[in-house]
Structure formats: C-alpha cells, structure tokens
Amino acid sequence: MASPEDLKSVIDKIHDSRIRYYRNENNCGAVNVVDNWNICLSYAQGDYVICMGDDDMLMPNCLEEYVKLFEKYPNLGVYHAWTELIDEFSNMFELQAPRQEWESVYSLIWNRWNGRLNQFIGDFCFDTKVLRQDGGFYKLPLAWGSDDISAVRAALKGGVANTQKVCFRYRVNSNTISNTGNNEIKIEAILQERTWYQELIAKVLDKPHNENDEFFFHCIKLSMPQYYAKKIRNTLADDIYQKPFHIFKWLLQTNRLGISKLQIVYCALLAFKKGVILKVR
C-alpha cells in the first residue's frame, strides 16, 4: 500500500514471519483501487486468498469454517463467509441474509439482484489459481461492482459454497468509497458493469444445466433492465442532490444511460426528498 501514515514503524514492532508488509511506490488512489487489489494478489503465496480492508475483521472461527468448505466442496473457485456489519466502534448493526451452503452462479446473481443488499470483496475467499486465470480481480472505476463480477467469474467454475456460521466482520464508515466517491464515475462503472452482464447472459449463461438454473436464468434476463435502471436512478439522485444543475447534463444522456427523461426527473424528486429529510433531521 502507499498510506500517508507511518505504518512501517507499527509493522516493525511486530516480529512474525507470517506477516509480510509491502509499500507501493505510488498510491493507486480510489478510482484505481482494484489495481491495488491485484498488486496484493501478486504477492499471494497460498492456495486461497482473501482481499479484505485493513479495518475489517476475520472472526476467530473464520479460517476453520473456510477449511470445512474446502474439504466438503473442493475445486470451487470461490467461497463466501456469512458476514456481520459493524460500525466505527465495532458494534454490530446488521447481519447478512443467510445463504444455502452451496449455490450455482445463477443463484448467486439472482439473489444478489433480489434481496442480498450487502456483499463485499472481503467476505469472499478465492482460489488463487482460478482468480489469476481470470486475470485477477475485475477492474471497474472505484471498484464499483468489481466485487460482484470477480465473485461471479470465479463461481462459473462450479458455483459458490457459503459458511453456515457468521465468521467475517465488515466495517462500515462514512469515509469508504461507497459513502464518498464521485457519482459521475460511479455511473460510468455501472454502465461498464451492465455491459459485462449483458455479454455474460448472451454468451455464457445461456445454457443452464438444470431446471432450477433455467428458472434463475429466466428471472435474471427479465430483471436485469429494471435492476440497472434502479441502480442508475439511485446514483443519479445522489449526484443531483449534491450538484442540482447536473440534471441538465443527465437529461442529454438518456440513451447512454438507458433510462427515460421522465425517470431523470424522478431522480431529481428523490434528490429533493433526500434534502428535505436531512433538513428535518
């Protein structure tokens, strides 16, 4: 990493051969944060790799639960840890919805688009070889959607196995890219993500292997336009709230965005509503 903080002095106090500390010559920055993920991947020496934030936490049972899955479901490209969300003070305030112990890539996509509101790069454990064969973590600006696509690509190799016990803690704070970040860049990332899924659906997922996956595939195709329209609307609303005059810019880009002028006006109303609620609070 290339943190402005004096982390080396902290690391120098720790004498443990299992800990390896690297410092980038240049900071990758928020827009290109996936470059840093892939730099970290290049240093990985084990069979499996977890890319977690420095303020996230592996719970004491995390690796044990993963090993159980490795033994029961060998040769998968990705595994997932049931995760609780914590605040800046390490207080748990939300729990991910439970998942079945194994699911196909079709189920992973469908459930992510329909109810699994929270999912992060750190709660996935990847087979290092598979991840490298895929070209590393999938790069999108601000990593906006990179975690989902990286997991989906790995899950194409046999699905994903999920721990049945909570074993990972993801920290939410006001300074994360999710809560800051440039909304215009986020829109660009969403458009790139949408294009990637369109190609996946057309060229890769079009031959499901059983009735369940046929059902999921049908639902994925039907729900995709609405899913991305909503994702774009929410981001536009945040952008218009911060920069009201941007509404005119977005009104000129309806074809590229894939939403109507009326929907952009609706985004402006959402932005206005958000402003009113914040003022009341």
Regions found by a protein language model. Give the residues of each.
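Acidic donor-binding segment of Leloir-type glycosyltransferases
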Residues: 1-26
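Catalytic metal- and UDP-sugar-binding loop of GT-A-like glycosyltransferases, i.e.
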Residues: 24, 52-54
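Conserved nucleotide-sugar donor-binding catalytic segment
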Residues: 102-185, 189
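Membrane-interface aromatic/basic loop that binds lipid-linked glycans or pyrophosphate carriers
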Residues: 222-281
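The conserved acidic donor/metal-binding loop of glycosyltransferases
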Residues: 1, 54-57, 82
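Glycine-rich, basic loop-to-helix element that forms the pyrophosphate-binding segment
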Residues: 25-44
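Short aromatic/hydrophobic "clamp" motif used to bind/position activated sugar donors
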Residues: 49
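Conserved donor NDP-sugar-binding/catalytic core segment of glycosyltransferases
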Residues: 61-95
